[in-house]
């Protein structure tokens, strides 16, 4: 019975299925995962669009409002901002052509009277605007009756020059620019306004001058024209005479002060020391007559030194405490004894005796004997000029022995040369710099 009832029930259900539809809904467990993936893809597409268009669309489709420039990128500099940047710009009419860089240039000169109105100042026309090419940019204010301010040599401004009432400032400033350009064109030391010691070293020595160094390495200068030595550089004096530059006197004073401060305790060295340092230096060539004059003058000076030595010994100055003396040059000693009657008498007596004692065998003597005897007897005069044998020159070679014919009160044999050197030796380090800055040598 039960089976029949079940079979009957199935038949009824089958009949009902033919007329009715049943809808079954199945939930996908992966549905949430697919939704997340799709959302991420959509976000990625939006980011790509933003990178391609970084600015919003309103920026590209913005309405231009000429009245208000506060929200426009093209109106960042309006009339009020221009007035704030440069007060002098309010006098320039908007109708006149203005340089594009003149708007942002600051006001460098405030000499314009604030009470002047814009109507009294004529507006610059387009033909009066001139631009000068340079590295910097500036705008000159419109001043009336004022000359242009000179600029630095290395700073030439890019200026807009205006002409007022037919008067133009361009020729003056162009001349100034050309003058500055001329000063900077040449690097020649002869054209510089200020001569430095480095520039002086590059200049050639004048004619007849020679630069030498003593045993201590101190530089001095020899003038073969006047037979003098000096510490001063003759090239600086030549610059003063020729008149190149404006600040050369100051440069020479600074150079000499710096040089004298470092070597104030030094005096001029002797010629003999310089020749020992540089033996291969070419000596100046002189004629026979000039050499005879030099030999005669050296002999006279030697006799004067011997006379001075005898006077010092007779007066007792050698045994007493020795005060500091100045370095005596040959020319100063000559001036000191020029008015002495005893000295004049000795000169005449020596000239007569030299003529009487001249014999034929003196012509065959070696000239260097006289030079060696002179260098040994007189340590103060260190002269080493080359001598050429000549019959007329050798007639004075017996004069070094003429001190035996001097008056008896001058005891020359008792003289100690080492005690006398402290008075007359020029190359002594303790007496350097005390005497004159210019010394004569023969």
Curated annotation (Swiss-Prot):
The modification Phosphoserine is found at residue 104. It is found in: Cytoplasm; Nucleus; Cell projection, Cilium; Cytoplasm, Cytoskeleton, Cilium axoneme. One of its GO terms (cellular component) is cytoplasm. One of its GO terms (biological process) is hippo signaling. Keywords: Cell projection, Cilium, Cytoplasm, Cytoskeleton, Nucleus, Phosphoprotein. Residues 1-10, 124-134 have a biased composition (Basic residues). Its main location: cytoplasm. Interacts (via WW domain) with wts-1 (via N-terminus). Interacts (via WW domain) with egl-44; the interaction may regulate transcription. This is Yes-associated protein homolog 1. It comes from Caenorhabditis elegans. The lineage of its organism: Eukaryota, Metazoa, Ecdysozoa, Nematoda, Chromadorea.
């Amino acid at each position: 019975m039960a089976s029949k009832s079940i079979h009957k029930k199935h038949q009824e259900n089958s009949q009902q299925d033919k007329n009715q539809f049943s809808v079954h809904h199945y939930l996908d467990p992966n549905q949430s995962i697919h939704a997340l993936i799709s959302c991420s893809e959509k976000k990625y597409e939006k980011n790509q669009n933003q990178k391609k268009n970084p600015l919003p669309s309103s920026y590209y489709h913005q309405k231009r409002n000429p009245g208000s420039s506060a929200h426009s990128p093209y109106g960042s500099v309006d009339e009020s901002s221009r007035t704030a940047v440069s007060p002098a710009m309010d006098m320039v009419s908007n109708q006149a052509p203005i340089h594009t860089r003149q708007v942002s240039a600051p006001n460098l000169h405030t000499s314009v009277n604030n009470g002047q109105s814009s109507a009294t100042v004529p507006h610059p026309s387009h033909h009066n605007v001139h631009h000068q090419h340079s590295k910097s940019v500036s705008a000159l204010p419109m001043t009336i009756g004022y000359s242009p301010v000179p600029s630095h040599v290395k700073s030439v401004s890019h200026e807009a020059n205006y002409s007022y009432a037919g008067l133009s400032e361009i020729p003056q400033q162009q001349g100034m620019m050309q003058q500055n350009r001329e000063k900077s064109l040449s690097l020649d030391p002869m054209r510089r306004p200020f001569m430095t010691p480095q520039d002086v070293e590059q200049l050639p020595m004048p004619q007849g001058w020679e630069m030498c160094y003593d045993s201590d390495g101190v530089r001095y200068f020899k003038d073969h024209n006047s037979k003098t030595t000096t510490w001063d550089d003759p090239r600086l004096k030549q610059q003063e005479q020729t008149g190149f530059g404006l600040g050369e006197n100051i440069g020479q004073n600074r150079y000499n002060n710096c040089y004298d401060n470092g070597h104030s305790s030094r005096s001029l060295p002797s010629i003999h020391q310089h020749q020992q340092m540089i033996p291969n230096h070419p000596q100046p060539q002189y004629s026979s007559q000039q050499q005879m004059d030099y030999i005669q003058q050296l002999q006279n000076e030697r006799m004067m030194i011997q006379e001075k030595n005898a006077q010092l010994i007779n007066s007792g100055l050698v045994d007493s405490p020795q005060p500091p003396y100045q370095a005596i040059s040959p020319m100063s000693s000559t001036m000191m004894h020029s008015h002495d009657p005893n000295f004049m008498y000795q000169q005449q007596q020596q000239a007569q005796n030299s003529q009487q004692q001249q014999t034929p065998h003196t012509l065959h003597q070696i000239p260097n004997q006289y030079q060696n005897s002179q260098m040994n007897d007189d340590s103060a005069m260190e002269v080493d000029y080359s001598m050429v044998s000549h019959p007329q020159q050798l007639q004075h070679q017996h004069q070094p022995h003429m001190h035996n014919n001097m008056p008896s009160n001058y005891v020359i044999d008792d003289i100690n040369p080492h005690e006398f050197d402290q008075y007359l030796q020029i190359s002594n380090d303790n007496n350097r710099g005390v005497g004159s800055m210019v010394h004569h040598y023969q």
